[in-house]
Each structure stands twice: as structure tokens, then as C-alpha cells.
Amino acid sequence: MAQAWAFLLPVLVLGSYVTSLFLPTYITGPLCGGDGGGRSLFLCAQAPKDQDPSPASTMYKTAFHFQPAKNWMNDPSGPMYFNGIYHEFYQYNLNGPIFGDIVWGHSVSTDLANWIGLEPALVRDTPSDIDGCWTGSVTILPGGKPIIIYTGGDIDQNQAQNIAFPKNRSDPYLREWIKADNNPVLRPDEPGMNSIEFRDPTTGWIGPDGLWRMAVGGELNGYSAALLYKSEDFLNWTKVDHPLYSHNGSNMWECPDFFAVLPGNNAGLDLSAAIPQGAKHALKMSVDSVDKYMIGVYDLHRDAFVPDNVVDDRRLWLRIDYGTFYASKSFFDPNKNRRIIWGWSRETDSPSDDLAKGWAGLHTIPRTIWLAGDGKQLLQWPVEEIESLRTNEINHQGLELNKGDLFEIKEVDAFQADVEIGFELASIDDADPFDPSWLLDPEKHCGEAGASVPGGIGPFGLVILASDNMDEHTEVYFRVYKSQEKYMVLMCSDLRRSSLRPDLEKPAYGGFFEFDLEKERKISLRTLIDRSAVESFGGGGRVCITSRVYPAVLADVGSAHIYAFNNGGATVRVPQLSAWTMRKAQVNVEKGWSAI
């Protein structure tokens, strides 16, 4: 039976009063907050049932990204690999395609590409989580015992941490979870803490004293912080007298993540095991509507994270992804000895569009994440399992792109494609000078330069989801700059002409990375196109950009085009270009909760 949808109605907030702009007689419902992406408050209310979705419901629905069959989703929560099965929990609204009534959705997979949706793992049914079962993590305790720790909100919206266990560990899908009798196990009840800014506990790790640790995002005396806690049994927690790390120049940190990495080694490290000599640690936080991170060391004596480089201006902090990507969560995959990360990509159309579609939000392709050999930044690449969806491979070798050239990549489905291309620079002498101030706002520089403005080296890259007359198209490209003794590469994903629709967010995303062009003249680009979701990986995963696009061309099968291009003054060679059509994955097909 179809679930009732919920209408979103903009409301005007005046002090403590809420005034609806329009309220039909059948509307009754609670007030919902913002969605974490900067969109406004809405009234959550029941709409008439059995309303037919618009064509946009299928036109923009992705073919191989993780999303539920319908309704709202946001943060990934507690991903894990257990007894041969991958589990993905996620923030989910059972009742409609808008933020509110959040429970833990639950899906399982054996290959990270095809997913079966199960009944929600956690629902709002106790005083400590009646306002929502918010984001959390899973930790595998000794003896192979998974345990969920998650944030719950009470009726007054105070936040606290709660525990849940599998009801039956012999069930391969862990379909039922039991909440601890002593929930909440952790409250923000110490001086200087903010009870409504205390959420998103990390996966636990074991310290040198044999005690468990975890971090919780919060505020401490007005500072943003990853608050640190200790426990002997993962049930009873004590706050450490100092945070894992804090900063006085940023907003509250959501969805912190803390994990170990080895420079130049793409093998993952399990935090519940001994960390090898020479390992670094990454501290990730979700802030300013993006995911940022620092690389440093975990000082065991101080029980604190120490960044390699302390940067006060958070505009200069490194990012996991430079596009529409937030609330990411990683986990150690013992199956293939790797660390996997994925994030939430929100819709960038409008709440009324979400209502018409009947769904909102998706998760990015799972990515392997590791530390570059120089120890300065994290690298990411789509997990290899996604390649199982490739079909209809086409290849081109030895292309040469001069200024103004446009080469069409034919015989693949331009709506669902995986494109890998290497750009080899014939000369690096013509690189334009680099201005360090651009690092403060690479998006602004992408917007000012654009793909049509010639430079010394670049722009060169891909034009995707292009209509016949190019009225609609998205550009993913590079520009190369010379900075003293090194080269800086700007990667952009320009959405300003991605759709003819005026009611969309259409920015020009961008990020810089250093590249040793004296040693290696080839810059790689991989772009995964999946209807309204586009993920691009530049320079071997040094910069990643997730974009959401809504072109009208998606309504007409076979009408979109993909091109390689060069608008720079210097000739660019393409020694290898490979592209594939991507098959549709089986992702949370709606068959009811008894699908397995």
C-alpha cells in the first residue's frame, strides 16, 4: 500500500511564532526543520494518497546510485561489512520526500552495486529518540558483535547518544535491532556543552590503555569540537577532559569521522586493531555545507589529534568533495582490506520538485579512500565493484585536441556512462601564472574563467549531458597554472548551463591540486554520469566533484551527447580514452519489506 506523501509549505518564522503562508484544510502535521543543505523550514503534513508522480520521478532517478525506492534520505549511517554482507544504514523518512520523521533505513548487498532494501533498523519509539533517530556509527566489538551508537532527540529536541544491538546475530541480514534499556548512554550534561548541538558519534577505536574511544560532534564553550569519550564496555562512557580536537573559527562540526591511513598505501586500517608505525590519521568534519578534513597524528600520550598543518582560515581546509556532498561516513572493509567512504548528495532543485518526484537525496558511489604518498591529502576512487555494471566499451587512442576542438564520444549511453580519459600536455611552458588568493574561493575562479575562456594550458576536459544545440550542457575540465617551482591544476564542474530551468542551483564547482608536471605530463579524469548525478575524479582522485543536474534532455532517450574538448592555447594529446554504458543496478527495488 502506498505511503501517504507529505506536503512542504514554506513558513514564516517570527520570534517563537510560526505563520503558514497557505494551509489547506486537510493539512495537519508537525514543524520540520531545515534539511542541512540550507533550505528553509517547512510544515510536514499529510497529502492525499495515491497521487501520481510527475515524469521527473523517473527522468531524474539514477540507475546505479544508492537511493531508496521513494521518499527522503540523507546521511549514510553506520556502514559495515559483517559475515559476508555489506550493510548501509541511512537517514530516512518513511512518510514522504521531505526532511522529517527520521528513522534508520537499512539495505544489504554482496557487491556494493546491487542493494536489497529491508525494514528500517531503528524507528522513533522511545523517549530518547522520539524526535528522530539521527546519524551514528557501527563498531564491531570483540567476538564479532556489531553495535550501533546513534544520536536520538527527545521531545524538547535535546540530543543524546543511544545504543542498539542485533536481536539475532545468526540472521545474515541483521534485520532486527534492540535498543539498550539504559538509553541514552551519553548526555551533554557537563558545563559548556550545548544540548542541541551534540550528535553523530564516530566508530569506536581502542586506545593503548585498552579502553574504547569515540568522538561526538558538538560545541564546547562556543568552540566547534570533536568531543572525546572513553569506555570499558562500550555501554558506559566517560567524557575525557579535553576534546579530540577543537577549533574556534568554525560552526558546529557534524558527522565527524576519524580513521588511520598509511602514506602511499591504499590498504585500509582497522581502528580496533594495532595501528602500524608511520601511520597518519584523518579527522573529517561536516561544516559549512561541505565535508572538510585534516591530516595529522594521533598523539597517544595526549589522547588528542594533532594536525600536521594548523590552518586557521577554514576556507583553506582540504575537502573530501568539492561539490554537492555532505555527511560522509567511512568504514573499514575487511573483505578487501580497504577503507570505503560515501556521502549524501542532496537535491538542488526545489522542495516542490521533490514532492513531485516522490523522492529526494542519494548516496555517492562508494569510494576507496587512502593517503597520498606525500602524506598531504586523501585520494579517492570508485570501488572496483562498480565496474561490473560496465558494458559496450569503446576506445580511442592517439587523439590530438587543438584549440577549439570538440571530439564526440559516440556509441555509449550518454545518460548512464563511465568515461576515463587521460590528457597529456605537449608543453608546460605556456601555463598561466597562479594567484594564491584563488585558493580561498576556487568556485568563484571557475565561474569567472569558464570553459569558453582560453588560457595558456586549458580549459580541456569533457562536455556531458549536452543537447543537440548545446543549449544544455555540463562541463568538467582542467586549467593548469604555474606557481613558483610547482604547478597547480584547477578542476571545475560548471553547471551554469546544465539546464534551461531557471529554478535550480547551478554553480560552478571547483578545487585545486598540486601536480608534478615535470615528472608526469598526463592528467587523468574519470566521470560517472548517472542521469541527475555526476561524479568526477581528477588527477587520480586528488579532486572529486559531485554534481546534481536536471537537464530537459533527459526526457528524450538518445538525445544527449558527450564530448572531449580543448579551448586552451596549448595542444593536448589524448593517448587513451575509454567509455562504457552503465547498466542499471538493482537498488532498493520496492517489493515490500519481505523482499528477502
Curated annotation (Swiss-Prot):
The gene is 1-FEHw3. Hydrolyzes inulin-type beta-(2,1)-fructans and beta-(2,1)-linkages in branched fructans. Has low activity against beta-(2,6)-linked fructans. May play a role as a beta-(2,1)-trimmer during graminan biosynthesis. The lineage of its organism: Eukaryota, Viridiplantae, Streptophyta, Embryophyta, Tracheophyta. SMART domains: Glyco_32. The keyword ATP-binding does not apply. Residues 1-20 form the signal peptide. Keywords: Disulfide bond, Glycoprotein, Glycosidase, Hydrolase, Signal. Disulfide bonds join C446-C492. It comes from Triticum aestivum. It is an enzyme of class 3 (hydrolase). This is Fructan 1-exohydrolase w3. Optimum pH is 5-6.
